[in-house]
Amino acid sequence: MSRKATIERVTKETQIKLSLEIDGAGEAKICTSVPFLDHMLDLFARHGLFNLQVDARGDIDIDFHHTVEDIGIVLGQALKEALGDKKGIRRYGQASVPMDETLASVAVDISGRPYLVYHVALPKVKIGEFDVELVREFFQAVVNNLGANIHVNVMYGDNVHHMVEACFKAFARAMDQATQVDPRIEGVMSTKGKL
């Protein structure tokens, strides 16, 4: 079973092509023109063992908002398409990741019901040129388009880069767990018979 998807999104604000292979080796080729986002997507692929290619162009002369949000949209769509009928997946994943002084935790339920809980109090508004409020926008876009319940929490931390990076690493590891196929599961992991 090949769990792959390629999604293209073209609007007046962005042009994005994203290819995802769930059962990958952590290989990434990322070009978004938003260097900090490139870094986060690269480590998402590596720590989740997903193969991920992203080629994105957007109206970054205005700001990074449309590009970041639209990549979240397309990543959510790609995950949903690659998972297909979701038969046999574990559905749930959870990971806590330390990064120096920071501890972040992400829990995922690929339930078909989009809901984001985001408890991340970042002490600064920017990382370089990147507006940190866009981290929430990214996760909200993934949640809405995958149809998942995702909780993102930073328990403590001081360095804003470490805090965001720990969130993306925890997200990668939790998503890796949730998307794994368990041979013991017949159908889908729900008493309703549908996700």
UniProtKB/Swiss-Prot annotation:
Pfam families: IGPD
Molecular function terms, GO-annotated: imidazoleglycerol-phosphate dehydratase activity
InterPro entries documented for this protein: IGPD_sf, ImidazoleglycerolP_deHydtase, ImidazoleglycerP_deHydtase_CS, Ribosomal_Su5_D2-typ_SF
TM region positions: none
GO CC annotation terms, alphabetical: cytoplasm
Pathway info: Amino-acid biosynthesis; L-histidine biosynthesis; L-histidine from 5-phospho-alpha-D-ribose 1-diphosphate: step 6/9
Enzyme class, UniProt record, top EC level: lyase
Major localisation: cytoplasm
Alphabetical GO biological process terms: L-histidine biosynthetic process
Keywords: Amino-acid biosynthesis, Cytoplasm, Histidine biosynthesis, Lyase
Compartment annotation: Cytoplasm
Reaction it catalyzes: D-erythro-1-(imidazol-4-yl)glycerol 3-phosphate = 3-(imidazol-4-yl)-2-oxopropyl phosphate + H2O
This enzyme's EC code(s): 4.2.1.19
Family note: Belongs to the imidazoleglycerol-phosphate dehydratase family.
HAMAP family: HisB
Name of the protein: Imidazoleglycerol-phosphate dehydratase
Protein's organism: Geobacter metallireducens (strain ATCC 53774 / DSM 7210 / GS-15)
Upper classification of the organism: Bacteria, Pseudomonadati, Thermodesulfobacteriota, Desulfuromonadia, Geobacterales
